[in-house]
UniProtKB/Swiss-Prot annotation:
Membrane-crossing residue ranges in chain numbering: 14-34, 51-71, 81-101, 145-165, 185-205
Record's keyword annotation contains Transmembrane: yes
Membrane topology: Multi-pass membrane protein
Gene: yegH
Keywords in alphabetical order: CBS domain, Cell membrane, Membrane, Repeat, Transmembrane, Transmembrane helix
Protein's name in the database: UPF0053 protein YegH
Primary site of residence: membrane
Domain called CBS: residue spans: 306-366, 371-429
Length: 527
């Protein structure tokens, strides 16, 4: 054990650790790029597993030095080339590295979103770990042969490997986060891997490329990229000092909507700033929902937000005055629909409650006929934006919705259109609009009104909807699936959710329970 006190041994250990780290940088870069393909919860485990297997592999190779030496002995010749086992391993590793780096570059340059879970379905944990281990084997062979040529003591070589791998484990997570958060650095690292792969292939054919040339090229590229990252940092600091990220994001969206392209560079800069902003939200959830609703406003028709004629509170034109007064006492609306008789389908117009009150205050008998006003008439296929414009031009807030035969299907108000953007706006005496009634239950399910519009439902429950559908409510969805009126207790599976009919009155679906399902199709809880 006298060698422990030998300064040359310690110098060799330190030198060997440095060399192991230098030779392991390319391995770390490859691990960083591969680990990013996995779901976030598996990335750390993949990195640690890959590096620990690399350490185990290098220790096993060091323990079998006598076998390792035989790898450099010639196996066969082909024309002017002589190949050993080490040369074949270098060739395989070089071609594998060239293939993987080329595929990764193609994915990045073709614009595939590596953060999109739908494009990352093929990334399996052990598949990624296997690729890491294959590259570890190739890089381990190179580093172990270097160690054998520098130090004579096996324990020193093993200690250097353990220390180097431990340092790489500590640096792997921040390196992975840094590399994958800067797209230009990812491209640069993949270019390095191409260079290293090419050098391995050349070395396998017996053409020795001095490592100094490779490291000089890599070092120069890193220096240029460092200057580039510094310039980007200064530019972002300048932009942030003049405008908040929220303002810049808003301007970028508005330029995109207006079709302006002259500030594309600034928009790209804003997008990069958003990526670097992490998980912190620039806009709160209410603002994001409102923006989404505004952008989808012209995709919805008045029939999707109207109040069905069956839910309209109406008054008979010939009703006695006492009945009118009783209706006014319990009424919660500012307008009443006037019908000719008790038939809710024969709508004559609307009267304003305030007009009736003024008539009563003047001591006049209540006369509905002279107070009737004609509302707007919308076809049921009218989009909401033109409807909003008609409300503005006509200076009225009320409209009848009719089908192609002229039959009144329901009513729609300016408040209905406003709620499509801002969400439900209940008045002082109204807890919540029944058409938008949805509550989340303690067991994780939802209870919704059957007449709730599907466009509002998907804000809470992400049901898959057919863009060409001819129905607009939950009840319509159930009837489309069953091809008849549902019965209480009947269930329909839509995507990952089970829709259970709870209440049906007069052939109308009143309440529906929406139950989330597990991926295997079973309920997440007992109903």
């Amino acid at each position: 054990m006298e060698w422990i006190a030998d300064p040359s041994i310690w110098a060799g250990l330190i030198t060997l650790i440095v060399i192991e780290l230098v030779l392991g940088i390319d391995n770390l870069v490859f691990i960083a790029i591969l680990a990013e393909k996995l779901p976030p919860k598996q990335r750390d485990r993949a990195r640690v597993t890959g590096l620990l297997l690399a350490m185990l592999m290098r220790l096993l190779l060091l323990a079998s030095i006598s076998w390792l030496v035989t790898l450099t002995q010639p196996l066969f010749s082909f024309r002017s080339f002589t190949f050993s086992a080490r040369d074949l391993i270098m060739l395989f590793g070089g071609f594998f590295l060239l293939f993987k780096a080329t595929m990764e570059l193609n994915e990045r340059l073709e614009g595939k979103d590596s953060n999109n879970p739908t494009q990352r379905k093929g990334a399996k944990f052990w598949g990624v770990v296997t690729q890491i281990v294959v590259l570890d084997a190739i890089f381990s062979l190179d580093s172990v042969i270097t160690a054998v040529g520098m130090v004579d003591h096996l324990l020193v070589m093993m200690a250097a490997v353990v220390i180097a791998i431990s340092l790489m484990l500590m640096a792997s997570k921040p390196l992975t986060q840094f590399v994958n958060s800067h797209p230009t650095i990812v491209i640069l690292c993949l270019s390095f891997l191409l260079m290293i792969g090419f050098s391995l292939v050349a070395e396998g054919f017996g053409f020795v490329i001095p490592k100094g040339y490779l490291y000089a090229a890599i070092g120069f590229s890193v220096m240029i990229e460092a200057l580039n990252q510094l310039a980007i940092f200064n530019r972002r600091r300048f932009l942030s000092a003049n405008q908040t990220l929220r303002q810049r994001t808003t301007e970028a969206v508005m330029r995109l909507l207006s079709g302006q392209k002259e500030d594309a560079e600034l928009d790209a800069e804003t997008a990069s700033m958003l990526v670097d902003h992490g998980n912190q939200q620039i806009f709160n959830p209410q603002e994001r929902r409102m923006i989404e609703r505004v952008l989808n406003l012209n995709q919805r028709t008045v029939s999707s937000i109207m109040t069905s004629r069956h839910d309209i509170e109406h008054i008979d034109l010939n009703a006695p005055e006492e009945e009118i007064r009783q209706l006014l006492e319990r009424n919660q609306h500012t307008r009443l629909v006037v019908t000719d008789g008790d038939d809710a389908e024969d709508l004559l117009g609307v009267v304003h409650v305030i007009d009736l009150l003024q008539q009563s205050l003047r001591g006049e008998p209540l006369n509905l006929r002279v107070l009737i006003r004609q509302p707007l008439v919308f076809p049921e296929t009218l989009p909401l934006l033109p409807a909003l414009e008609q409300f503005r031009n006509a200076r009225t807030h009320f409209a009848f919705v009719v089908d192609e035969f002229g039959s009144v299907e329901g009513i729609v108000t300016l408040s209905d259109v406003t709620e499509t953007i801002a969400g439900n706006l209940p008045n002082e005496v109204e807890e919540i609009d029944a058409r938008h009634d949805i509550q989340k239950n303690a067991d994780g399910s939802w209870t919704a009104n059957g007449h709730m519009p599907l466009e509002d439902l998907v804000q809470y429950v992400p049901l898959p909807l057919d863009e060409k559908r001819e129905y607009h409510t939950i009840a319509g969805l159930l009837m489309e699936y069953l091809q008849r009126i549902p019965k209480p207790g009947e269930e329909v599976q839509v995507g990952d959710y089970l829709l259970k009919t709870l209440q049906v009155e007069s052939h109308r679906v009143q309440k529906v329970q929406i139950i989330p399902l597990r991926k295997d199709g079973e309920m997440e809880y007992e109903v």
